[in-house]
Amino acid sequence: MDKVFNVGKLVDFQWKLGVSIASNHSSQLNTPFITVFVKVLDSNSEVTSHSFELTIPEFKNFAQQFKDMSNMIETL
């Protein structure tokens, strides 16, 4: 079994849809993306904020992984 790392407790999860309006590559203009914002409570009771951007296919994969985790938890 894979090792499990305790990285903290997820206390907030937000996302927003954006569209690229400036880029060094014209092929990336008007490309939609998702920005994800998370807040995590660590073992020292400190909240840290993190953000990252995903393409639409990456976000769909990310969302599917959460659905899969939810389904697995429901079977326990």
From Swiss-Prot:
GO terms for molecular function: NF-kappaB binding. One of its GO terms (biological process) is signal transduction. Residues 9-76 form the COMM domain. It comes from the Eukaryota. PROSITE patterns: COMM. Belongs to the COMM domain-containing protein 6 family. Component of the commander complex consisting of the CCC subcomplex and the retriever subcomplex. Component of the CCC subcomplex. Scaffold protein in the commander complex that is essential for endosomal recycling of transmembrane cargos; the commander complex is composed of the CCC subcomplex and the retriever subcomplex. This is COMM domain-containing protein 6. The lineage of its organism: Eukaryota, Amoebozoa, Evosea, Eumycetozoa, Dictyostelia. The gene is commd6.
